[in-house]
């Protein structure tokens, strides 16, 4: 049965342990969502959980960019889906550091961050956008992975050092005027094909991908469920700034994977542990019984299977 959930923002119990300032911040975010046309509290549980805009403050300067790169990212919420969700993933690309994030979600974050009246209704992004952002040190491969949990929950952060074993082929094609070469690999449960540009000798790509002697301009999983294609590439020198955000929880990668599995397999219990209350409804708008709500599961198709 296709189900939806109504989140009664006014009755959200803010988790104990947050400071008074953080509680006020969460309350303002949730209350403002109630004022948005179309009732943002009603959303499709067969899709990813909606990412809510957050306030981004400038932190330390990590380095200078040489390029800004935008990819169109299409992915299937479940392997059975015929339709794709779509986002734009932006890279701020330097020679030693790369920052990767959802450009559309950043637009909503920026609108909230720079709003003159932060108690006014916020701009909420449409569609299922990637809740991840990354900072990757290209000299060591160490990557900071950040993930915003649903409904103004804490931001999870963990460190990762991904390794890629690419097989570079002799196959070539031109993408946006750049000659690229095909490489393949198995990474965390999925097989990938990557087209990289040796003429841009920076070992990077969307999200935390890299490890090739050139920038990845196109990346697809061979099962057809995830596909990044180049949308724009421009030379641009700018500070690559680490964002400062509130409500950060440090975890390990195994702890993060466990959280995501629990979120999708046992969402009611997971929301409750975050101090959130949600009220699932069926297609007819009737609230589910407690037993039915506990049986509710969210389809899960992460890009990293392992």
Whereabouts are the PLM-identified features?
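Extended soluble regions of mature proteins
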Residues: 49-306
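Bacterial Sec-dependent N-terminal signal peptides
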Residues: 1-57
């Amino acid at each position: 049965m296709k189900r939806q959930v109504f989140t009664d923002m006014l009755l959200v119990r803010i988790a104990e342990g947050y400071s008074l300032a953080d509680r006020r911040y969460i309350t303002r975010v949730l209350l403002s969502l109630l004022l948005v046309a179309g009732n943002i509290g009603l959303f499709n549980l067969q899709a990813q959980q909606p990412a809510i805009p957050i306030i981004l403050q400038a932190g330390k300067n990590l380095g200078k960019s040489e390029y800004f790169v935008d990819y169109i990212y299409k992915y299937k919420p479940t392997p059975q889906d015929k339709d794709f969700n779509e986002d734009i993933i932006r890279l701020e690309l330097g020679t030693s550091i790369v920052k990767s994030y959802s450009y559309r979600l950043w637009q909503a974050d920026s609108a909230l961050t720079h709003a003159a009246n932060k108690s006014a209704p916020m701009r909420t992004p449409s569609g299922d956008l990637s809740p991840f952002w990354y900072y990757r040190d290209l000299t060591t491969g160490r990557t900071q992975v950040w993930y915003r949990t649903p409904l103004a929950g804490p931001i999870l952060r963990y460190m990762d050092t991904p390794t890629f074993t690419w097989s570079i082929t002799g196959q070539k094609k031109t993408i946006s005027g750049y000659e690229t070469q095909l490489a393949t690999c198995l990474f965390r449960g999925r097989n990938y094909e990557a087209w990289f540009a040796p003429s841009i000798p920076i070992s990077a790509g969307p999200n935390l991908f890299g490890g090739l002697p050139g920038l990845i301009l196109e990346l697809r999983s061979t099962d057809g469920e995830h596909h990044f294609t180049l949308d724009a590439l421009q030379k641009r020198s700018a500070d690559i700034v680490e964002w400062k955000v509130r409500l950060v929880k440090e975890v390990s990668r195994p702890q993060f994977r466990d959280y995501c599995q629990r979120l999708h397999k046992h969402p009611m219990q997971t929301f409750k542990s975050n101090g959130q209350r949600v009220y699932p409804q069926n297609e007819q708008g009737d609230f589910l019984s407690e037993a039915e709500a506990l049986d509710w599961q969210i389809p899960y198709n992460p890009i990293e299977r392992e």
